[in-house]
Amino acid sequence: MDKKSARIRRATRARRKLKELGATRLVVHRTPRHIYAQVIAPNGSEVLVAASTVEKAIAEQLKYTGNKDAAAAVGKAVAERALEKGIKDVSFDRSGFQYHGRVQALADAAREAGLQF
């Protein structure tokens, strides 16, 4: 089993458990250059809120879009947008990525901005 298939396997297992809970999910995806965050409805068919380093408004504030500072900016932005829509509680879906570095920075920034998970 290679690295990518192991990550997908972990993500599938976690998503199955989150689906059973029926909770709103904060989903994180990262690439070497960008990081993306989406708040997805409990049924899984609708993206309620999204933020990423691809967005011009966020990317203009950053020197580089693939580091922890960028992840923190995305976490803060997605939390603010979720709170505007009345979403306070979410379940954190790290998509099989290790809870470390950029993923952790995004989660910490979202918590500091007011999201609860």
UniProtKB/Swiss-Prot annotation:
It comes from the Bacteria. This is one of the proteins that bind and probably mediate the attachment of the 5S RNA into the large ribosomal subunit, where it forms part of the central protuberance. InterPro entries: Ribosomal_uL18_bac-type, Ribosomal_uL18_bac/euk. Keywords: Ribonucleoprotein, Ribosomal protein, RNA-binding, rRNA-binding. Belongs to the universal ribosomal protein uL18 family. SUPFAM superfamilies: Translational machinery components. It comes from Cronobacter sakazakii (strain ATCC BAA-894). Part of the 50S ribosomal subunit; part of the 5S rRNA/L5/L18/L25 subcomplex. Contacts the 5S and 23S rRNAs. The keyword Cell cycle does not apply. GO terms for molecular function: 5S rRNA binding; structural constituent of ribosome. The keyword DNA damage does not apply. This is Large ribosomal subunit protein uL18. GO terms for biological process: translation. One of its GO terms (cellular component) is cytosolic large ribosomal subunit.
